[in-house]
Amino acid sequence: AAESAAESAAESVTAATQGGKVGVCIYKFDDAFMTTYRNALQEILEGKGYEVTIVDGNNDQAKQNEQINTFITQGVDALIINPVMTSAADQIISTVKGADVPTVLINREPTADQMSAYDKLVYVGCDAAQSGTFQGELILDTENKGDINGDGKVSYIMIQGDPENIDAQLRTEYSVKALTDAGVEVEQLDLQRGDWDRNKGQEICQNDLA
């Protein structure tokens, strides 16, 4: 999924500018999915002759804003931005529009109104609803369909990367919907924010299972 998404992002860049320098802002490097994504992106773009610089936002939106401004000052021909915070989309879009830099937003989808604010802006992401459905189907494919204790329902802990993120919302909704559509009774025991952090997710699970 990461490789195909990276290829789509690269295609969006080539549609906007032929050659030149591309600045890539990743919300944080310490994320397995985004590591695969950025490595694939760099390989694809450099293979097409682009000069690529990728920076780590360290999960800090203020730092990422500075990185975007630095890239603009350096005169990049295009930007690829994986926002730290979904709520920062307005500011990011205003900045790149003011600089007239073609920009690809990845992995955290803005609203339709935000996307329409700048004609050189595109979004590339996975089908989050489909991803959520696949997650639910994985549970349905287990021997007991997720009903481990045999009480006739699937009791679950839901860990969301970021509740403000549209993709996270859709994955949450459709993973559960896949179960209920199959006639499975469900019970949510806990809903926590995990910030796409494996250690935090493990800690939440350990606390809930204690």
Task: Give the role of each language-model region.
Residues 1-210:
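A residue-level marker of the well-folded mature domains of exported/periplasmic proteins
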